[in-house]
């Protein structure tokens, strides 16, 4: 009797631990889902930025085909590009690498690229360089600095989504427990005839009724 009782407790403990492990895995999966969604946004941002850079080079190219590039119009294009956007700074260089026009934050390129081991302003940024195409080769280059730093509000939104998913999983677990206890309360089914249960030797009411009819 004691051995059967011990087996029953071990069997029940294994089931409970297995269910808890599944619950933890589901909650971790919710966190992974939110983080993966955030990581997928960075390549999309880079792709959109490169498309924008190519469009800007098409607008700048006619202004650089003369011996003296139109610096004022190029500067106006760059100012519009960096005005209240995720583009921290933008610069146009000639084919020799000399700066023609620049707009945005006044941070040196050496500091922006962290060549000295220091990240300017603590930003997580990314550089994009797009050639300005001409008939006989590149007329110059356009350099953009993208701000890939996740804002506090965006990070908070990701955390809120993760917490909501976890809460939904816990609510699903609670609903399952309540339904199980409600539907099976006071009833014994055939699965309760398992040799691991203490009630295995007692007949199910359905069996009793069938025996009486016979």
From Swiss-Prot:
Subcellular location as annotated: Cell inner membrane
Secretion signal, residue range per the UniProt entry: 1-30
Coiled coil region boundaries: none
Membrane topology: Single-pass membrane protein
Membrane spanning stretches: 164-184
Pfam families: SMP_2
Mutant lacking the gene: phenotype: No visible phenotype.
Induction of synthesis: The nucleotide sequence of the putative signal may have a regulatory function; it may form a perfect stem-loop.
Keywords: Cell inner membrane, Cell membrane, Membrane, Signal, Transmembrane, Transmembrane helix
GO CC field: plasma membrane
InterPro entries (alphabetical): Uncharacterised_Smp (IPR019305)
PTM remark: The signal sequence may not be cleaved.
Domain of life: Bacteria
Family per similarity comment: Belongs to the Smp family.
Identification of the protein by name: Probable inner membrane protein Smp
């Amino acid at each position: 009797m004691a051995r059967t009782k011990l087996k029953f407790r071990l069997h029940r403990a294994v089931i409970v631990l297995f269910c808890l492990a599944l619950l933890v895995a589901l909650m971790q999966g919710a966190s992974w889902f939110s983080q993966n969604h955030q990581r997928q946004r960075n390549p999309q941002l880079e792709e959109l930025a490169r498309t924008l850079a190519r469009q800007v080079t098409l607008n700048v190219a006619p202004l650089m085909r003369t011996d003296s590039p139109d610096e004022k119009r190029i500067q106006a294009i760059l100012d519009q590009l960096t005005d209240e956007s995720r583009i921290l700074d933008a610069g146009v260089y000639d084919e020799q690498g000399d700066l023609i026009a620049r707009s945005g934050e006044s941070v040196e390129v050496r500091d922006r690229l962290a060549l000295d081991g220091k990240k300017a302003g603590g930003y997580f940024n990314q550089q994009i360089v797009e050639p300005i195409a001409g008939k006989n080769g590149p007329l110059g280059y356009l350099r953009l600095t993208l701000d890939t730093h996740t804002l506090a509000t965006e990070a908070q939104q990701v955390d809120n989504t993760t917490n909501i998913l976890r809460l939904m999983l816990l609510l699903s677990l609670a609903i399952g427990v309540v339904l199980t206890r409600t539907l099976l309360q006071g009833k014994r089914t055939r699965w309760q005839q398992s040799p691991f249960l203490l009630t295995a030797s007692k007949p199910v009411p359905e069996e009793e009724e069938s025996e009486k009819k016979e």
